[in-house]
Every structure is written in structure tokens, then in C-alpha cells.
Amino acid sequence: MDYFNKIIIDIELHHVEGIRECFENGINPNDLFHGSPLIDEMITMYTRTPRFKECIKVFVDYGLKFEDPVLLAVLMDDSEMLDKLILQQPEIVIKRYSLKCTYTPLEDVTLLHICAEYNHDACARVL
């Protein structure tokens, strides 16, 4: 089976177990897809479901290297992690991000905008 093509479909469908299966069969969460990190495909895909944060957690469980722990906390809707990070660096609540999402490009937005885009209300409450 071609697990690399499979994971792209599973990412599009937010198929948590399918993504896990791909990682179990040799796909690395830090691989590139069309020159960008595979996680970017997950973040920028047009699908929006409650399973999104579970998919992100599977990437993390299998060794995702993600440079921005604050953004990662929001993408996972991990309000406890976000709260700890804000206590360490309160200025992060006004940091700006740009994500090239398929339907709604998020250009120069705050973490709260990202919470709204992905319907991550636990982190939105912290912010």
C-alpha cells in the first residue's frame, strides 16, 4: 500500500485512525509534501471537523517537531498547555500568525482568530 498517498486522503477526511495507521507503517510526521511539512497539509486543508485536534495529537504522538509550542497548543485545543505558556510569556496573546488555509487564509491574525477558525473553544476561553 502507498501510505504516503493514503495519509493525504486521511488528512483531508480527518481520519484519525487512518493517520495513525500511516505513521505505524513508516510515514514520518516530519516528512515533506510538495516541499512543505506534512503537518502544513493538515493545518491548511479545507476540512473543519471536531476530529482536527485529534489528528494533530496523533502527529505529536508520533514525534512531530513543531517550532511554535503556543500555536501547537491552540491547534490541539490544549487549554492547559496554552495557559502555562501564557503565564510564562503573556505577550504571546498578541503575537500575529499567517496560515495559508484553503478557504479562509489567515493573514496576520491572533491566536483567538485561529481558535475561531478551528472551533477550538477551550483555548479561546483561555485567551
Model regions and ranges:
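Ankyrin-repeat helical core positions
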Residues: 11, 23-24, 43, 47, ...
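N-terminal alpha-helical scaffold/docking segments in eukaryotic complex subunits
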Residues: 4, 8, 15-18, 22-30
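Short, intrinsically disordered, charge-balanced linker/junction segments flanking boundaries
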Residues: 112-113, 121-127
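Conserved ankyrin/ankyrin-like repeat signature
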Residues: 18, 51-55, 81, 122-123
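Short helix/loop capping segments that flank catalytic or ligand/cofactor-binding pockets
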Residues: 95, 119-120
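Ankyrin-repeat boundary/"N-cap" motif
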Residues: 1-9, 31-46, 65-75, 95-114
